[in-house]
UniProtKB/Swiss-Prot annotation:
Protein name: Putative olfactory receptor 10D4
Protein source organism: Homo sapiens
Family the entry assigns: Belongs to the G-protein coupled receptor 1 family.
Record's bilayer topology term: Multi-pass membrane protein
Pfam families reported for this sequence: 7tm_4
Gene name in the database record: OR10D4P
Amino acid sequence: MRNHTMVTEFILLGIPETEGLETALLFLFSSFYLCTLLGNVLILTAIISSTRLHTPMYFFLGNLSIFDLGFSSTTVPKMLFYLSGNSHAISYAGCVSQLFFYHFLGCTECFLYTVMACDRFVAICFPLRYTVIMNHRVCFMLATGTWMIGCVHAMILTPLTFQLPYCGPNKVGYYFCDIPAVLPLACKDTSLAQRVGFTNVGLLSLICFFLILVSYTCIGISISKIRSAEGRQRAFSTCSAHLTAILCAYGPVIVIYLQPNPSALLGSIIQILNNLVTPMLNPLIYSLRNKDVKSDQP
C-alpha cells in the first residue's frame, strides 16, 4: 500500500448531537463494554472447560464469542478514551488498522452466522447423521474458512481506501474509521473505491442472506413435519435465537452500506448497536439461556 497523503492523523468527531452528554455516554458504554467482555469470556471458558459442550454447535458459539470480543474491542476503547476527555485524534496507521479489523471481523461475522445456520439445518433436517456430517474436520474447515474470507475481504477494501491521497481535511464524521466516513476526505476521485466497496459488501451480504434463507426454508419445512408440539417448540426455540442475532447483525449493514446518503446521527446509532450492543447481547441470546451452558459456567 503506497502512502500518498500529507495527513498524519485523523480527528474522530464522535457521535453527532451529543455535546454535554460525554459523562453519561462514558458510563453507559463502559458498562456495555464490560458486560460484553465478561459475558463472552464466561461463555468461552464454559465451552472450553466442559467436554459436554465439545459439540459443533458450541464450537461455533465459541468462535462467535471470540469474534464478539475482537469486534467490540476494535472501536469501543478509542471511543471511551475520548469520551473521558482525552484527544479525539487517531494516527493514520491507527485509522488503517481500525478499518481493516472492522471489515475483517464484520465479514467474518456474516459468514459465521451463515455457517451456524447450516449447522442448525443439518441438526434439524438430518438428526441421525448430524455427528457424522458435522465432524471435527468439517467444523474446523468451516470456521477457518469464515476467518479467511473475512481477511481477504478486508485486504481488498483497506488498500483500496488508503491508496487514495488524503491531503487536507482530516475530520472523520464518525466515532471510528470506516469507509463511508473516510472516503469523502480523499483528495481524489473516490468513485472506484465506492463502487468496489458497495459491490463487495453487497455481494457478500446477499450470498450469506441467500444461504441462510435456504437453510431456514428447509428447517421450516422439517419443523412443520414434526408431529409433537414439544418437538416443534424445541426446534423453533433453537432457531429463534439465531434468527434474532442475524437481524441485529444484518440490519446495520443494510442501512449503512446500501443507502446512498445515510444521516450521520442515524449511522452512529446503528453502528453503536452493531459494535457494542449486539456483542453484549449475543451471550444472552445464544448461551446464557441454554441450560447446558448455565450448568457448566464457573
